[in-house]
């Protein structure tokens, strides 16, 4: 009975048998946590190396390449939009900073107190475009690594296996106490509220046309909002499918027979994946 596998909610996930599909869900969750921890210990350039590594990894998944390419294109567009938005905010910040410094110098000259005046400067950015681009790439790389790694895991693992892998851990059971299904049901409403709040922010910014920031970033903000709205609608759809999948199979802690169906032993490939991922991040950190 323990070897029996139910047909998951998405048939294309269960029908594929690539190397990434065969890795246990617990190992994939560990790799995700390892990637997210790397945000705090790796530099910009090393994060770009991690992003390219994810792209190379996705290219090795020979099955379902159409789905992989579709999600890669969506995530890449969102990452580029995040970089452009950050770069626009950086330019607007630098422009307003110089304008404020010029205004302070002019007022000081008018009051004849220029002898001891030292203009206030904030040295976050210089005039070099490369430094501003490097600063703008950071949020884009964060976004790409986070979202694309999650999508790769979701493509190669059924929603039920991921949910049950989290559900069977002792820490989650102690914290949530059989509320996992409620969390998945609630997540779709949370993302829906995010879309509504983004629409309100856009309306407020459009009404306040006198803002200096609006003159430099309205177009890119509108584009970023439209892409984000499309992206969050995809997440709402994913979350709804997960909640429906869990609900139709009557997930609860007392149903031991149901949990036994998904129990499986860790294999050699799982140990190899754990070793390679841990060594890879360690080498990037020490180099």
Swiss-Prot record:
Organism of provenance: Porphyra purpurea (Red seaweed)
Family the entry assigns: Belongs to the ycf92 family.
Keyword Protein transport recorded: no
Subcellular location: Plastid, Chloroplast membrane
Source organism, top-level taxon: Eukaryota
Region forming the signal peptide: none
Protein name: Uncharacterized protein ycf92
Cellular component annotations (GO), alphabetically ordered: chloroplast membrane; plasma membrane
